[in-house]
Amino acid sequence: MDLCDRWEIQALLERHGFRFSKAMGQNFLIEGWVPRDIADASGADEQTGVLEIGPGIGPLTAQLVRRSGKVVSVELDERLYPVLRETMADADNFTLIEGDAMKLDFPQVIREHFAGLRPILCANLPYNITTPVLTKCVESRCFDSLTVLIQKEVAERICAQAGTAEYGAFTVLMQYYTVPELLFTVPPTCFLPAPKVTSAVIHCPVRKTPPVNVVSETTLWRTVKAAFALRRKTLVNSLQTGYQLPKEQLTEIVTACGLPAAVRGERLTLRDFAALTNALAAAEQAK
């Protein structure tokens, strides 16, 4: 069965009485080059254990099982369980987990299914869970890389440079844990039903060690969250949402870090955020 052929897909779904759910962000791939190129970009091979989230009917899954030592796919929509059992019936290195990926313990899944294998994430992620899923993946520190098809706008945010409109707290988070690269875009015509936006594939090798030294990651994310809380305001004003320090002291801390007093949060690089975090932590400790 060609899992990217529009007519075969429609026949398969009709046979199982399936209707697309907008609430679940379901858009199935109908161009074979897309799942093939995603699987290639992931670097999956016989020594790889792949976690896939949101397999749909399995076009990317089919590419991954051909390359990988083991594929574990997590699907929330119970209507797709019998569909996947049919489309993946011949794959002896495939396991379906029925449930919500956001409720899974990723390190435990890897221990149970990927012993001796290099764990990676490779998925055509539903748009509505992209940010929380990627956040959960990087914070779990258990994947070697993430290769995902997501909304192009989100991909550009993840790969953005400091000082651009796309740069934000999520950018800093992803670039702290990974080295993201936008590989290629995927037009709406490659999906059924066609979404209203263009998609993109990003590959994110996970860093072995943090790129900067901070007093604690909790304090770093506190600083980043505060810095972007009031995007139209200066960094000093924004920091007041997260730190109970006098404005004058915050200004002194910002300038001591080599930043202009009137700088805005989106101008700070990851290195700037690390220096600022450590200075703020020291100021609080001295109170």
Q: Where in this protein do the model-derived segments appear?
A:
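C-terminal lobe and adjacent flexible extensions of AdoMet/dcAdoMet transferase-like proteins
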Residues: K225-K287
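Catalytic cores of RNA-modifying enzymes
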Residues: M1-A226, T255, E266, A275-N278, ...
